[in-house]
């Protein structure tokens, strides 16, 4: 097994991404941070992949995203799978990582459907089924602090992978050199039809399905809602209006996506503050 310095030097030699090169430069003077970034590879499992943003094999970045996606693409080829759906949340670099996933899939002949903007995770599950995709990928780290991001994989049923599926993919992922992944630009793949944006008609159909499943009437209710700087900032208000709420008050300072979660720091101590902001 190669040691930290060997892997660090390889990245300095082979990486071309400007953000990663800057990150590697900062690691030169910080031994502890360098060790943390390179002492292992990020581990893929049933929950997908999650890690701190930054340069290194133990961090989430464009190279580790490419590695995982190429491994999944190779696994898909074995099964004859050729369709994938991709979306992302409001976290730092989520949109970049979603683009990266789509670019690698398309380079491998996988027809890829991608949302034009960030969406809630359940929407990814929906479009995976709606587009008859074999695999769905959601770039998100759920409830974790802002310095994290993640990569969640879903099956054709819109559910997270079971243990057996994740284990099979791990074998393919471990074979990939992150600096030797064929890719291109999202724009060229959209032009060629290998990548397709999810349209407003599918978003409307999703809201229709949600509306069918409501178990209580909302007419007459006045609702205060905070997206907490996350992905619900468009679909939730749209859904509430469809439910004919009497009034809707959205917390202004938390109404727009913010990957730094500036107004709602993660942690139990801040839960009370979030409620006070809303009411």
What do the PLM-derived regions correspond to, one by one?
Residues 273-279:
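Positively charged, low-complexity/disordered segments
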Residues 15, 33-38, 42, 149-272:
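Gly/Ser/Thr-enriched, mixed-charge loops and adjacent short helices
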Residues 2, 6-101, 108, 187-190, ...:
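An N-terminal, well-structured beta->alpha segment
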Residues 49-51, 56-58, 91, 119-120, ...:
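Short, glycine-/Ser/Thr-/acidic-enriched flexible segments
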Residues 85-148, 239-272:
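N-terminal small/polar loop signature for handling phosphorylated ligands or for N-terminal nucleophile
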Residues 16-19, 23, 128-134, 144-157:
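N-terminal glycine-rich phosphate/adenylate-binding segment common to multiple enzyme folds
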């Amino acid at each position: 097994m190669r040691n930290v310095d060997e892997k660090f030097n390889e990245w300095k030699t082979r990486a071309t991404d400007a953000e990663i090169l800057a990150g590697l430069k900062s690691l030169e003077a910080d031994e502890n941070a360098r060790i943390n970034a390179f002492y292992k590879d990020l581990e893929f499992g049933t929950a997908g992949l999650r890690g701190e943003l930054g340069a290194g094999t133990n961090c989430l970045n464009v190279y580790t995203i490419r590695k995982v996606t190429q491994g999944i693409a190779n696994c898909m080829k074995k099964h004859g799978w050729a369709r994938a759906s991709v979306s992302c949340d409001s976290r730092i670099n989520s949109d970049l990582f979603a683009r990266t996933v789509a670019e690698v899939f398309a380079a491998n002949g996988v027809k890829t459907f991608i949302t034009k903007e960030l969406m809630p995770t359940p929407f990814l599950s929906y479009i995976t089924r709606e587009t008859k995709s074999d695999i769905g990928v959601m770039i998100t780290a759920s409830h974790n602090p802002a310095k994290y991001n993640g990569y969640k994989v879903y099956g054709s049923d819109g559910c997270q992978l079971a243990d057996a599926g994740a284990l099979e993919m791990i074998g393919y992922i471990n074979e990939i050199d992150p600096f030797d992944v064929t890719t291109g630009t999202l724009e060229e793949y959209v032009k060629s039809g290998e990548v397709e944006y999810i349209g407003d008609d599918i978003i409307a159909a999703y809201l229709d399905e949600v509306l069918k499943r409501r178990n209580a009437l909302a007419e007459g209710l006045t609702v205060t809602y905070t997206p907490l700087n996350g992905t619900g900032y468009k679909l939730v208000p749209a859904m509430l209006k469809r439910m004919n709420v009497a009034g809707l008050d959205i917390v202004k300072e938390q109404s727009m996506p913010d990957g730094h979660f500036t107004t709602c720091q993660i942690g139990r101590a801040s839960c009370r503050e979030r409620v006070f902001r809303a009411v």
